[in-house]
Amino acid sequence: MGNDISLIALLAFSTLLPFIIASGTCFVKFSIVFVMVRNALGLQQIPSNMTLNSVALLLSMFVMWPIMHDAYVYFEDEDVTFNDISSLSKHVDEGLDGYRDYLIKYSDRELVQFFENAQLKRQYGEETETVKRDKDEIEKPSIFALLPAYALSEIKSAFKIGFYLYLPFVVVDLVVSSVLLALGMMMMSPVTISTPIKLVLFVALDGWTLLSKGLILQYMDIAT
C-alpha cells in the first residue's frame, strides 16, 4: 500500500513538473523576452521556438540550481518519504524555504497580498482580522499564493524588458521607411532593408550574449 501511494505521488509530481517549471521559475521571463526579441528583429521562426525554449530552460536551470540543491539536501538529510503525508508536508513547509524566499523576493507584493487574502477568504468564508492584515505583516505566505503572484510578476517584468528592447528596432524600421519614402522607393518593403540592418547590429553587439547575461544577473543573489 505504501509503495502504491509513493508511486501515485511521484506520478502526480511528474505531471505537474512541466507546469511548475514553466510558471514557477525564471523560465517564464526568459522565454517571453527571447520571443519578443526575435519578433523585434523581424524573424518569424529563426531561431525556432524549440531552440529558444531550450536556451531559456538551460539558463533557468543555471539560475535555479542553488535552490534545487538546497531542497535536495534537505530531502536527503530529513529522509523524506512519499508515503508519509506529514513528512511531505514538513518538506513543503521547511525544505522549500529557499524556494519560498525566492518567490517572495521576485513577486509583486500587492499580488502576493491579493492571492494570500483571496486564499484566506476562501478558507474562512468571510473577512477576518487575519484577512485584513497589512502586507508587511505576512511573514510566511503560502507557496500556493506565491506561485500565481510570481508568474504574473515575471510576465509583467518580461514585457517591460521586451518593450525597452523593441524601441531601438522600431527606430531602425522608422528610419528605413523614411529613407525609402524620401528616395521615392515606395514600392519596396521596408522590412526587406531593415531586417538585415537589425541583424547586423544585433550580431555586432553580440546581442544574445548580452541579453542572456543581463537576464541572469537579475537573479545572481538568490543563493545568498
Curated annotation (Swiss-Prot):
Entry's Gene Ontology BP terms: protein secretion
Entry's transmembrane regions: 8-28, 55-75, 161-181, 185-205
Gene Ontology CC: plasma membrane
InterPro entries: T3SS_IM_P, T3SS_YscR-like
Topology class, membrane: Multi-pass membrane protein
PROSITE patterns: FLIP_1, FLIP_2
Keyword Amino-acid biosynthesis found: no
Keywords (A to Z) from UniProt: Cell membrane, Membrane, Transmembrane, Transmembrane helix, Virulence
Keyword Metal-binding: no
Subcellular location: Cell membrane
Superkingdom: Bacteria
PANTHER family: FLAGELLAR BIOSYNTHETIC PROTEIN FLIP, SURFACE PRESENTATION OF ANTIGENS PROTEIN SPAP
Assigned protein family: Belongs to the FliP/MopC/SpaP family.
Function field: Involved in a secretory pathway responsible for the surface presentation of determinants needed for the entry of Salmonella species into mammalian cells.
UniProt name for this protein: Surface presentation of antigens protein SpaP
Source species: Salmonella typhi
Taxonomic lineage: Bacteria, Pseudomonadati, Pseudomonadota, Gammaproteobacteria, Enterobacterales
